[in-house]
Swiss-Prot record:
Protein name per UniProt: PKHD-type hydroxylase Reut_B4660
EC primary class: oxidoreductase
Residues that bind 2-oxoglutarate: R169
Keywords, ordered alphabetically: Dioxygenase, Iron, Metal-binding, Oxidoreductase, Vitamin C
Record carries keyword Amino-acid biosynthesis: no
Taxonomic lineage: Bacteria, Pseudomonadati, Pseudomonadota, Betaproteobacteria, Burkholderiales
Cofactor(s) needed for function: Fe(2+); L-ascorbate
Species this chain originates from: Cupriavidus pinatubonensis (strain JMP 134 / LMG 1197) (Cupriavidus necator (strain JMP 134))
InterPro entries: Oxoglu/Fe-dep_dioxygenase_dom, PKHD_C, PKHD_hydroxylase, Pro_4_hyd_alph, Pro_4_hyd_alph_FE2OG_OXY
Amino acid sequence: MMLQIPDVLSKAQVAQCRQMMDVADWTDGNATSGHQSALAKRNMQLPEGSPVARQIGDLIQDALGANATFFSAALPLKVFPPLFNRYEGGQAFDNHVDNAIRYLRGTGFRVRSDLSATLFLTEPQDYDGGELVIEDTYGQHRVKLPAGYMVLYPATSLHHVTPVTRGARVSSFFWIQSMVRDEGQRALLFELDTRIQQVAEEMGQKDSGVVGLTGVYHNLLRRWADA
């Protein structure tokens, strides 16, 4: 399941992030690459653990914690601290699959990457190219979203970023370990939760059908989740 989530960050929050990022020091993006990715990756990245990366990462994590759609879709158990990249001057990232396990350097923290996320921090009209292209059994999906919007997709997906030929594409990217490992079960729970909310708006939270379906949702979550 691929999902676009609007307004994870407000325009004011995006501007605040960009103000800090635009004066920060950037390094070669291969600092966080695995072997396969290092052969495919051409971009710049904020150093992992830098004060700017930590400050903006905390802001993003707070925003995710307040976003009901993100929680319903991802059912997050762990979120890898957000990283930040920049593409310009023809830079791109060829087809690859993200590493299954991500380690936070210098700590014992690790995340199984069930879901990948890209949070756009540049308006689409400010650069050419730079589309995130995600492949699944239905074909290719080309993603280029407004600043503050996020795309969430299975970390098992082949994906690439097309060359940026004008301007610069700045974004945050990170991985989520879900309480529900199985993608199909997770998608079913998200669909069920969404439908329950729709019925509740029409019938009210105290409607017996809403109460019953909510019980079904939680019992399925109890059966499938690791917490």
